[in-house]
């Protein structure tokens, strides 16, 4: 089974974690550089927009448990200072590591793939908008992929439909 880790438990990281837990994926590690473990457990359980996550939560000094799944929790502000073991895929939701060079330390710790929640301009990194260009993904070619940007994810599907059905000569955002 693939093991996931999430760096950055803000809005996007929190919902990535929730999606993985609800699909019974194995999440072994989360990190957020600000706040205490008690605060993050509370923020995972209660969301100001989406309400309470219907799950059982507890924590100790080093981990958060969600529905009997224990997840190591760290508060490191840099990749160089994290302690990472047995994680296959990292989902980086920090908004900070937006270049290949900044993400390389994950691979030095044994991570096989990195998914970044922010766009990265690099021809060796795939910026994917599901429903628009997910067919460009090649697991042998890309070890880092991004989910593009919020603006791109909102605009690209609409632009694709308009362009394919009516045509677009040029535009700007």
Model feature map: region roles:
Residues 1-172:
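N-terminal Rossmann-like NAD(P) cofactor-binding subdomain of oxidoreductases
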């Amino acid at each position: 089974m693939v093991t996931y880790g999430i760096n950055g438990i803000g809005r996007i990281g929190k919902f990535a974690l929730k999606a993985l837990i609800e699909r019974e994926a194995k999440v072994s590690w989360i990190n957020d550089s600000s706040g205490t473990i008690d605060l993050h457990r509370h923020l995972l359980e209660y969301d100001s927009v989406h309400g309470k996550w219907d799950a059982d939560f507890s924590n100790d000094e080093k981990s958060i448990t969600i529905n009997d799944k224990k997840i190591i929790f760290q508060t490191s502000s840099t990749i160089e200072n994290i302690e990472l073991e047995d994680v296959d895929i990292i989902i980086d939701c920090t908004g900070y590591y937006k270049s290949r060079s900044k993400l390389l330390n994950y691979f030095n710790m044994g991570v096989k793939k990195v998914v970044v929640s922010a766009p990265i301009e690099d021809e060796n990194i795939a910026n994917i908008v599901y429903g628009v260009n997910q067919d460009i993904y090649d697991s042998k070619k890309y070890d880092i992929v991004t989910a593009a940007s919020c603006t791109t994810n909102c605009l690209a599907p609409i632009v694709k439909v308009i362009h394919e059905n009516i045509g677009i000569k040029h535009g700007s955002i």
